[in-house]
UniProtKB/Swiss-Prot annotation:
Subcellular location: Cytoplasm
Native source organism of the sequence: Polaromonas naphthalenivorans (strain CJ2)
Keyword field: Cytoplasm, Exonuclease, Hydrolase, Nuclease
Region Disordered, residue ranges: 1-22
InterPro entries, A to Z: Exonuc_VII_S (IPR003761), Exonuc_VII_ssu_sf (IPR037004)
Family note: Belongs to the XseB family.
EC class name: hydrolase
Signal peptide location: none
Protein name per its UniProtKB record: Exodeoxyribonuclease 7 small subunit
Function: Bidirectionally degrades single-stranded DNA into large acid-insoluble oligonucleotides, which are then degraded further into small acid-soluble oligonucleotides.
Length: 93
């Protein structure tokens, strides 16, 4: 049932940082990216993934994290513009 490392590597989904037809597409929304990232973290933390899938998962996670951070930064920039470039303090109840 164990695969050789060469066949395991060839069966892994490639994840590339640049535009690549074989790389998974980025989610359409922050929420979708966050949901995928949370599921990925759970699978990575389970300790049940083979090494090649751990690497692919880590790479995908880094891609999703960058997407989420970029979206948050874009929204923060828009809020700054709407608020006159100065954010109001966040009041927690």
């Amino acid at each position: 049932m164990a695969k050789s490392s060469a066949s395991s590597l060839s069966s892994a989904k490639p994840v590339a940082a640049g535009p690549d037809a074989s790389a998974p597409a980025l989610p359409v929304s922050y929420e979708a990216a966050l949901q995928e990232l949370e599921g990925l973290v759970s699978r990575l933390e389970s300790g049940q993934l083979p090494l090649d899938q751990l690497l692919a998962g880590y790479q995908r996670g880094a891609q999703l994290l960058k997407f989420c951070r970029d979206r948050l930064e874009a929204v923060e920039t828009q809020i700054k513009v709407l608020e006159g470039t100065e954010l109001k303090p966040w009041l927690q109840a």
